[in-house]
A protein has these predicted regions:
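Preference for intrinsically disordered or flexible, low-complexity segments
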Residues: 2-249
Length: 249
């Protein structure tokens, strides 16, 4: 699935109309994708079986691939469904065409699970996550499917504006006066990522999702509504598509 320049410009007009001008951000130029910038993501309702890049909805995981379970035997919940055509065009990647990158997480309404999906640089935390408390799968598109106990109402990605996340030129005394972006975004620079050296040298940043951006009833998908989920894609995706974890500031 490709997102055309015309469609992105239309999205931009909608964002400006609905959200107004933000003096802290600049307009996006989509000609060469967003691999050299970070762009805010806002969301709108879409069908659960939509082929568009989205939060939630049904998975396209083929029947010959087992639904992912965490080490406790719990079925994971689909967080993101991302067509590789979209990722390739938007981030200048070289993933297999006509595939889907599916991101799953541990989620329980009534039990504490924050520590199972959180990573702040500790090796044991990363080991937990890679053992299957979250899962990133690259696969061909199968029929729509859901085996989780939960189905998040699907939310389509809409590109907003380019974000200025470069704080290196800002004096320390001025940092307290700056409103740092803490929402959902896609691009090459994350926001509020704690501990820059996470030991993910073989991965590159793809996008982040703010817990409060999930639909009503699922603001606790990352346990806390102000948690942020970070998606990193593996440069050697043949054996390990990526890693997904959360942080809470």
């Amino acid at each position: 699935m490709d997102i055309t320049l015309e469609a992105l410009l239309e999205h931009q007009q909608i964002v400006q109309k609905n959200l107004g001008k933000n003096p802290k951000v600049k307009n996006v130029e989509y000609k060469d994708g967003v691999e050299k910038m970070s762009v805010e993501i806002i969301f709108k309702d879409v069908e659960n079986e939509s082929i568009k890049p989205r939060l939630g909805g049904y998975s396209f995981l083929p029947e010959n691939i087992d639904w992912p379970l965490n080490p406790n035997g719990d079925k994971l919940t689909l967080v993101l469904s991302l067509p590789t055509n979209f990722l390739n065009k938007t981030l200048n990647l070289n993933l297999p065409q006509e595939h889907v990158l599916s991101v799953f997480t541990t989620y329980k309404k009534d039990d504490y699970f924050l520590d199972l999906i959180t990573f702040h640089g500790d090796k044991e935390e990363l080991k937990n996550i890679k053992n299957g408390f979250t899962k990133v799968l690259l696969h061909e598109a199968g029929d729509i499917r859901n085996e989780s106990d939960y189905l998040i109402p699907a939310q389509e990605f809409i590109f907003g504006e380019e974000l200025n996340l470069d704080l290196e030129a800002v004096d320390d005394e001025d940092l307290d006066e700056i409103e740092i972006y803490c929402g959902s975004l896609i691009g090459n620079i994350p926001s509020l990522l704690q501990i820059e050296n996470l030991g993910l040298d073989d991965y590159h940043f793809c996008l982040q999702i703010y817990g409060g951006d999930f639909p009503e009833g699922f603001h606790d998908l990352f346990s806390l509504s102000d948690s942020i989920g970070y998606l990193f894609i593996n440069n050697n995706y043949d054996h390990d598509a990526g890693v997904f974890f959360t942080q809470c500031t």
